[in-house]
Amino acid sequence: MRPILLQGHERALTQIRYNKDGDIIFSTAKDQHICAWYAHNGERLGTYHGHQGAIWTVDVDPTTTIIASGAADNTVRLWDVKTGKCLKTWDFNTAVKRVEFNEDATQLLAVTEQRMGFLGTIVVLDINLDVNGPQSDDRALTITCAESKATVAGWSYMSKYIIAGHEDGSVSQYDSKTGELLFNTQVHEPDLQVTDLQWSPDRTYFITASKDKTAKLVNARDLEVMKTYVTDTPLNSASITPKKDFVILGGGQAAMDVTTTSARQGKFEARFYHKIFEEEIGRVRGHFGPLNTVAVDPNGKGYASGGEDGYVRVHQFDKGYFDFTYEVERQVRQQ
């Protein structure tokens, strides 16, 4: 797998997202702008300027009409994908660490930081998909995280629940209409934060990554842990591959803890695990520093990773990836 190296950011990557068609990649970094790229050749489609601080998060609606971003300047911004125009800015008391559209992009959730006496919150905003129409200032729902702040969050199937990962390693399930807390489960080791939460294609289950060096596959309905992937390094990101039963994990020693310059020493590789058998099946090297974010093409043709080194690496899966099977899987096919 020869990667395409995308060099559009001057500082560490924070998040990568593919659009639903898998042909455009959006990336954010700590350098105040969002980049859009063509996935097949790495050509830059454009940049979105306006934020006044590190951008932590981005998401794109299913029709690739609008994108939303959250940043350290305490704002959520809505952008027109085609023109790069900022359609709306919502102000908050603290930094916004995660944004995600629901399945039909009529609502957007935003996770805010706990800081300066303000508690961490999950806020839901109503979205108008017409780029020429007005956007509402009102918050449709505010969930306050009094126990432990939320670090990541997302919408389950049919936008039924809001699932949040917390700083204390727990995962919560909220009713998306009322904001009522339905479940809270200690999925990861106490006080080691959940660093990422990404969905299966049908949003009935999700994968979490954590500083406790594990990733977990969790059922969205009852927060039951179905699979555990054990690694030897703190994880920053985890993603589920469609088509094949794999998960991709990314992490590495924290940048400030790195004392050696060898990429091998810091464990800066994307790791592939078998989703069902929980075994590591391969690694992809390349980043010079921890992997901060991994994202998989929704069509299952490839994946992208973003690192502390400021690069996005886009990989197209080759034939060997699609042909790979466990002996058990081969036996089942032959029957």
UniProtKB/Swiss-Prot annotation:
GO terms for molecular function: RNA binding; translation initiation factor activity. Keywords: Cytoplasm, Initiation factor, Protein biosynthesis, Repeat, WD repeat. WD repeats lie at residues 8-47, 50-91, 145-184, 189-228, 286-325. Its main location: cytoplasm. GO terms for cellular component: eukaryotic 43S preinitiation complex; eukaryotic 48S preinitiation complex; eukaryotic translation initiation factor 3 complex, eIF3e; eukaryotic translation initiation factor 3 complex, eIF3m; nuclear periphery. Component of the eukaryotic translation initiation factor 3 (eIF-3) complex, which is involved in protein synthesis of a specialized repertoire of mRNAs and, together with other initiation factors, stimulates binding of mRNA and methionyl-tRNAi to the 40S ribosome. The eIF-3 complex specifically targets and initiates translation of a subset of mRNAs involved in cell proliferation. It comes from the Eukaryota. Component of the eukaryotic translation initiation factor 3 (eIF-3) complex. It comes from Sclerotinia sclerotiorum (strain ATCC 18683 / 1980 / Ss-1). The lineage of its organism: Eukaryota, Fungi, Dikarya, Ascomycota, Pezizomycotina. This is Eukaryotic translation initiation factor 3 subunit I. Disulfide bonds: none annotated. Belongs to the eIF-3 subunit I family. It is found in: Cytoplasm. One of its GO terms (biological process) is cytoplasmic translational initiation. InterPro entries: eIF3i, WD40/YVTN_repeat-like_dom_sf, WD40_repeat_CS, WD40_repeat_dom_sf, WD40_rpt.
